[in-house]
């Protein structure tokens, strides 16, 4: 019986709170009547609204800004158009393409190189000038395959090792510095 009284008292209390909250106008809330808005001077300092009122004002401002953005929409580009103009599609068949990548990870003599494709490639560190191949170094690559996949005997799906296949050609910075040295001597 006590549980029933508590639940009934809780609903009565919540009804009372709802009536109290929604019957009173919010302080500092603007009204639509012209006489009251005329008495407020725009240059007079506004009283700082608290809690719910300030949250409501911020939310209303965000809604107004969102509506303004919707009124002036940017031209929407279709997925087909974005795909057609993407650098990966412009590349064409990947076999024997020369690209520039950046070394982002090194494990012993394995260089993990990101060249902007779907997957990165792993190349061995060369014996000559191997100490120059550090993280962040830009290198030249010749792509062999963008994704190493294979269909195993009896399998119905391709299995990938999430890597691309490429041959490391050398450092990009050294090639750039040589061309810079040749230009002033001409």
From Swiss-Prot:
Question: Where does this protein chiefly localize?
Answer: mitochondrion
Q: Which residues carry this modification: N6-acetyllysine?
A: 132
Q: Which residues carry this modification: Phosphoserine?
A: 72
List the PANTHER family hit by this protein, alphabetically.
MITOCHONDRIAL 28S RIBOSOMAL PROTEIN S28 (PTHR13447), SMALL RIBOSOMAL SUBUNIT PROTEIN BS1M (PTHR13447:SF2)
Q: What is the protein's given name?
A: Small ribosomal subunit protein bS1m
- Record region (Disordered): 29-50
Q: Keyword Membrane, does the record have it? A: no
Disulfide bonding pattern of the chain: none
Polar residues composition bias: residue spans: 29-42
What is the similarity comment for this entry? Belongs to the bacterial ribosomal protein bS1 family.
**The keyword Secreted appears for this protein:** no
Its keywords, alphabetically, are: Acetylation, Mitochondrion, Phosphoprotein, Ribonucleoprotein, Ribosomal protein, Transit peptide
Gene Ontology CC entries for this record: mitochondrial inner membrane; mitochondrial small ribosomal subunit; mitochondrion
Q: Which gene encodes it?
A: Mrps28
Alphabetized InterPro entries for the sequence: Ribosomal_bS1m
Span of chain positions assigned to the transit peptide in the UniProt entry: 1-70
| Compartment(s) where it occurs, according to its Swiss-Prot or TrEMBL record | Mitochondrion
GO biological process per UniProt:
mitochondrial translation
Q: Which residues form a coiled coil?
A: none
